[in-house]
Amino acid sequence: MKSAYIIFACLLLMCTAAFAGEADVIEVEVRRIGGDTYKFDVTLRHADEGWEHFANKWEVTAPDGPVLGTRVLAHPHVEEQPFTRSLSGVKIPENLTEVIVRAHDLVHGYGGKTVEVKVPGK
């Protein structure tokens, strides 16, 4: 019986990381700061649990996949949810009228809610 409890406890610990879910992009604001350069303010929601499981970056991508900009998140935001961070200097090719913003966490990688946004002035 004791071994059943140990197995159950191990399974519970292994599954705990999955409960935080994937990192979701919930809002994006884009501003042109000159020429083909833009600033992104991105709001994420993720149930950060600490250094082992937190949203560690978000990216601006072209619809066909190339990454145009990455904002690294250096620490967990356990007590600050949702949270907004900015990235300036994102170069967007002239032919793109929309981009996709996606978030990444240390356990699940990509896969949460993404936001497709129109590029101002295009």
Where are these regions (language model features)?
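Edge beta-strands of extracellular beta-sandwich domains
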Residues: 110-119
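A short, structured loop/turn motif at beta-sheet edges
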Residues: 32-36, 60-67, 91-97
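Short, surface-exposed binding/anchoring microloops in extracellular/periplasmic proteins
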Residues: 21-58
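Bacterial N-terminal signal peptides that target proteins for export
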Residues: 1-8
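The feature marks short-to-medium sequence segments in extracytoplasmic or secretory-pathway proteins
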Residues: 53-78
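N-terminal signal peptide c-region/cleavage motif recognized by signal peptidases
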Residues: 15-17
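Residues lining hydrophobic/aromatic ligand-binding pockets adjacent to catalytic sites
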Residues: 59-61, 86, 113
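Short, solvent-exposed, Trp/other aromatic-anchored flexible loops in extracytoplasmic proteins
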Residues: 69-100, 104-109
